[in-house]
């Protein structure tokens, strides 16, 4: 459908077009892709891994202040893809929800419950005229004592689901295709990290430097969400280069 034939339906979040589309929600997905960041996440064996690009857009920016990985609780981490201001707002909301859950019930909020709650909030943003959908997508990883490693994703439409492997961002179709071909269910932590790096490197057609990628990991042996430092990333990049 042409731009002109939308007949004003793109101006209102709460009104469906005759074709059953919510244009403002679709535009939120486009905002995510326009940030030109790709994120991949996977769970395998006893670990879950998330990897995303790190882009420092100006020379005068302090690199340590640029990140797309955030800790929600001690054991739940996330990668945010899309508009960074919207991303930080959603992370803050997730932290509040997790803290409130712990205060009310006395134990940590499970990752699937947290993702469902964030998705529910996102869905409300699609039906209230005074709000706009957030231009970001959240990928959560955690190690759950009952269900093992977990990867969950939610988006501006309020959809959420658990995944064995998933991607978000500019090259999501290519990354999903790569993961479908290469994914194995019983990878070690090292192999899972290297698969995530190789996936991003392949679909983006670039050779990463340690300061150009961020990686978060949780595992059965260390369920605390941990962000790898540049030295650890360099070790994995070296091993990938040696295999090639």
From Swiss-Prot:
SMART domains: Proteasome_A_N (SM00948)
Listed SUPFAM superfamilies: N-terminal nucleophile aminohydrolases (Ntn hydrolases)
Keywords: Cytoplasm, Nucleus, Proteasome
Gene3D superfamilies: Glutamine Phosphoribosylpyrophosphate, subunit 1, domain 1
InterPro entries: Ntn_hydrolases_N, Proteasome_alpha, Proteasome_alpha-type, Proteasome_asu_N, Proteasome_sua/b, Proteasome_subunit_alpha6
Compartment(s) of residence: Cytoplasm; Nucleus
Signal sequence, renumbered to the chain: none
GO process annotations (BP): proteasome-mediated ubiquitin-dependent protein catabolic process
Pfam families: Proteasome, Proteasome_A_N
GO cellular component, one term: proteasome core complex, alpha-subunit complex
Main localization of the protein described in the UniProt heading: cytoplasm
Subunit structure: The 26S proteasome consists of a 20S proteasome core and two 19S regulatory subunits. The 20S proteasome core is composed of 28 subunits that are arranged in four stacked rings, resulting in a barrel-shaped structure. The two end rings are each formed by seven alpha subunits, and the two central rings are each formed by seven beta subunits. The catalytic chamber with the active sites is on the inside of the barrel. Interacts with PI31.
Function noted in UniProt: The proteasome is a multicatalytic proteinase complex which is characterized by its ability to cleave peptides with Arg, Phe, Tyr, Leu, and Glu adjacent to the leaving group at neutral or slightly basic pH. The proteasome has an ATP-dependent proteolytic activity.
Family: Belongs to the peptidase T1A family.
The name this protein goes by in its record: Proteasome subunit alpha type-6
Species lineage: Eukaryota, Metazoa, Ecdysozoa, Arthropoda, Hexapoda
């Amino acid at each position: 459908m042409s731009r002109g034939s939308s007949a004003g339906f793109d101006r209102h979040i709460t009104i469906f077009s005759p074709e059953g589309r919510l244009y403002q929600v679709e535009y939120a997905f486009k905002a995510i892709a326009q940030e030109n960041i790709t994120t991949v996440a996977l769970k395998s064996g006893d670990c879950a891994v998330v990897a995303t690009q790190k882009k420092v857009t100006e020379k005068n920016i302090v690199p340590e202040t640029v990140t797309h990985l955030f800790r929600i609780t001690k054991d739940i981490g996330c990668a945010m893809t899309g508009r960074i201001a919207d991303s930080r707002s959603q992370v803050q909301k997730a932290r509040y929800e997790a803290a409130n859950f712990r205060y009310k019930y006395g134990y940590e909020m499970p990752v699937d419950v947290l993702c469902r709650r964030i998705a529910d909030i996102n869905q409300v943003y699609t039906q209230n005229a005074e709000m706009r959908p957030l231009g970001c997508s959240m990928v959560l990883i955690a190690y759950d004592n009952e269900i093992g490693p977990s990867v969950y994703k939610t988006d501006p439409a309020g959809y959420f689901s658990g995944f064995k492997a998933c991607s978000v961002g500019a090259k999501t179709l290519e990354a999903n295709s790569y993961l479908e071909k290469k994914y194995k269910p019983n990878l070690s932590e090292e192999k899972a990290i290297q698969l995530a790096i190789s996936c991003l490197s392949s679909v983006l057609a670039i050779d990463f430097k340690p300061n150009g990628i961020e990686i978060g990991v949780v595992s059965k042996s260390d369920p605390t969400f941990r962000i790898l430092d540049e030295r650890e990333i360099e070790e994995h990049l070296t091993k990938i280069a040696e295999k090639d």
